[in-house]
Amino acid sequence: MSNRTYSEEELLSILAAFGITDVVKVARYGSGHINDTFKVDDVRGVSYILQRINTDIFPDADGMMENISRVTSHIRSKGGKSLEVLGYKNPWRLYAFITNARTIDLIENADQAFLAANAFAQFQNTLADLPEPRLNEILPKFHNTVNRLKLLDEAASADVKGRLKLVQREMDFINARREEAGRIVNAMASGEIPERITHNDTKINNVMLDPVTQQGVAVIDLDTVMPGSALYDFGDMVRTSTAAAAEDEKDLDKVFSRKEYFEALVKGYLKDAKFLNAAELDALAFSGRLITLTIGIRFLTDYLAGDTYFRTAYEDHNLVRCRTQLKMVQSMEDQRDEYERIVRDTAKSM
């Protein structure tokens, strides 16, 4: 994550390159980990989102913007609405700001879980017939848990900060679950689970909500749209939307997966995810555990590597995040039978 600061003169110069000159305010915006994001207001009362693409994370900025352009054009061609990509100048881009909508970082009720899951299901469903060619794979092996384990092993072996001795409990927890890490990857390789176009960052704050009706207005943050498994998207919804506490909650007694939110996600998602095959449905509950484990692995890897990827606020921030994810995995495992029953019963009723 970039921690650099920008002078007002720099930002105004960048905005001028997009033809935006009558600016009254530019301020940092949002809570994202990766890109530098600013909200821009002009004298007419029109607002924009100005964003610097972090090319350390997204080296193929051209390929990413090509994906976004193709996806948004396809959505519009089917009568949907999308963010308009106004342009970008290496590596900056400018979007129209969606008014009369809001995002939330922590889900507030089960109804929001239903609406968010339904919004992502509609997003996937709309893109199911996107014409060839295949979208660019912006972040290869992004949700590949087997590969994430390999990177963890490399970070543990290097132990550049001498932190390995502090995380033996976390390593033991992860190692005990290695056998199931390849379930989705292997099923995709065999063709049992199909490749689909997926969002790959399905947090609640990537669905904009109408502040009055609470209905989903738009799916945003399309940087990671690329080929993948629908299970990755659903699994990340389970990870983020069923969590009773923040991603970096230190008190693990507050961290657990909420069954009523899981049930709302399943009902909202399956309402429009008619494209899922039997193998995908069978792995739907499992996907939440797997993606949560995968993110925990990523946080631990970054901690061992010296905190080079995720922005941190204090020395052990990534370790705290890892522990939160692993506690969520344990909570989902404790409720495994009930979660799988919810999926079966909901699928039968649809």
Question: Where do the language-model regions lie?
Answer:
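ATP-binding pocket architecture of kinase catalytic cores
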Residues: 43-134
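Juxta-kinase regulatory segment immediately upstream of eukaryotic protein kinase catalytic domains
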Residues: 1-27
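Short secondary-structure junctions
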Residues: 16-23, 77-81, 273-274
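Active-site activation/catalytic loop segments of kinase-like enzymes and analogous catalytic loops
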Residues: 231-274, 290-309
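Catalytic activation segment of kinase domains across protein kinase-like and atypical kinase folds
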Residues: 191, 205-246
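ATP-binding glycine-rich phosphate-binding loop
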Residues: 21-41
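Protein kinase-like catalytic core scaffold
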Residues: 48, 81, 93, 196, ...
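ATP-dependent phospho-/nucleotidyl transfer catalytic cores
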Residues: 2-3, 27-31, 51-52, 59-62, ...
